[in-house]
Amino acid sequence: MYISQLIAADAVHQVFSGRNLTLALPAALSLFPAATPQQKGAAADLSYGTLRFYGEIGAYLTQLMEKPLTDERIYALLLVAVYQLLHDKADSFTVVNQAVHAVSQLKRPTAKSWAKGLVNGILRNFLRQKDQLIHKLKMNEVAIYSYPQWWINKLKIQYPDHWQSMLETGNQHPPMTLRVNTQKISMTDYLQLLARQDIEATPIGAQAIILTKPQAVEKIPGFNDGIVSVQDYGAQLAAPLLDLKDKLKVLDACCAPGGKTGHILESANVAMTSLDSDESRLQRVQSNLDRLSLEANLVVGDASSTSWWDGVPFDRILADVPCTASGIVRRHVDIKWLRREADVASFVAQQAKILPSLWQMLAKGGKLLYVTCSVFYEENQGQVDKFLQQNADATQLPFALFTNDHYSQTNITHINGQLIPSTAHDGFFYALLQKN
């Protein structure tokens, strides 16, 4: 167990040094080349779990320590161990003993008796005082919800009827959702294919299936053949909202990693241009298209500039703009702790440059779908309202997010295009604009 604790502690330490978990975890794993697949899997679970509930765990440790711990690696190890004591099924005394042993494995001056004694004492005090600690924190919102206070306050103001459920949903394990290419296989046939391989699944939309138990992608039937893709149900709403028709000229701006580009090409025979500012990210888009046996014109360029554009207008534009990603926090648990309140305004400013730039490239009568994976109003309807005030030739079109009684979870809770995160989907925002 101590190997997994050490890996997770290193990853958590990196995150609090400013690195996102997607990069931090592989880097931490590379330090332990002899780790078994089971140890690596456990380390990933501990990393995600610790960051998911850091607000709660950190509040407990604050009460247990006389003063802040200056050694950040020891503190990260304590965070991981307290997460295990709170949320893991492992035996409590095994967790404590393994954490103490982990200290001795650190190749640092901290691997001394004082550090081992500190870790042992804090963890055992936590076990003894757990009930009293819980009582003391019952009014501490950061501890209760495991979000920064500014985030909690913002949702309270913007979603007075939904803020608690949104916070709680963000702390759940995300579902694994598939998008079935119904041009290649029907939903019925694909569900039967899953059943033959003893993979339980529930259809929740016209092309969406949630797996009861997440699978490695290489074990998903038809994935390598392009029959299915992994994509959140909320993200699957983009392509249908674009009102696609064959032969239209379509732009997917800020396209990486390419899930929506693939869905657009599966939906209609269009002339597809996919834009991203990062060439390395476009390589991932190309790999995804190769798997799906689809083609698009991939362009390295800045969506806030027209310098890359040939001047021929697009009939449809998907503007999936950079954002705080506050609506997909259950998939990216580090976002809660890496984001700062000031970042919201920074993203709003970036979006405000992209929208007018893309609008110039839209044909008259064309449609632009503005998309974020955020739940913050400033980035969403607030951004759209400002754009409409400044552009008389823009109209926001009403739309219905798809409901079909054949599927048990298809009815989506949304407020003016804002998906309220639920067990079935993440918190995306959609606004459909037409050029008059």
Residue ranges, per PLM feature:
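S-adenosylmethionine
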Residues: 1-436
